[in-house]
């Protein structure tokens, strides 16, 4: 079991690592919330084939397709 001194040393080590430029891999732009259009564009480019397959299935009428679109848009809210 770690002692309090070891826990403090571990926290210091983590803090030092986070301050090291080698560990700062995300730029400010990468950590900013994407716009809805950027989010939807990325989503459709990554999962375009799957979404197109779903769209073409007979079980998807207009209402269900709209529900799918709104559900995908709702995923954008995780960035708030």
From Swiss-Prot:
GO terms under cellular component: nucleolus; preribosome, large subunit precursor
Name of the protein: Ribosome assembly protein 3
Regions annotated as coiled coil: none
Subcellular location: Nucleus, Nucleolus
Gene for this chain: rsa3
Biased amino acid composition, Polar residues: 11-26
Function as written in the Swiss-Prot or TrEMBL entry: Required for efficient biogenesis of the 60S ribosomal subunit.
Signal peptide interval: none
Region (Disordered): 1-35
Source organism of this protein record: Schizosaccharomyces pombe (strain 972 / ATCC 24843) (Fission yeast)
Keywords from the named record: Nucleus, Ribonucleoprotein, Ribosome biogenesis
Oligomeric form and interacting partners: Associates with nucleolar pre-ribosomal particles.
Organism classification: Eukaryota, Fungi, Dikarya, Ascomycota, Taphrinomycotina
Biased composition (Basic and acidic residues): 1-10
One Gene Ontology term from the biological process aspect of the record: cytosolic large ribosomal subunit assembly
């Amino acid at each position: 079991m770690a002692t309090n001194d070891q826990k403090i040393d571990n926290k210091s080590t983590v803090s030092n690592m986070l301050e090291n430029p080698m560990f700062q891999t995300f730029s400010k732009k990468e950590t900013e919330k994407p716009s809805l259009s950027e989010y939807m564009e990325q989503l459709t480019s990554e999962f375009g084939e799957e979404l197109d397959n779903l769209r073409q299935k007979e079980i998807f009428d207009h209402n269900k397709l709209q529900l799918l679109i709104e559900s995908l848009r709702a995923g954008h809210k995780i960035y708030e």
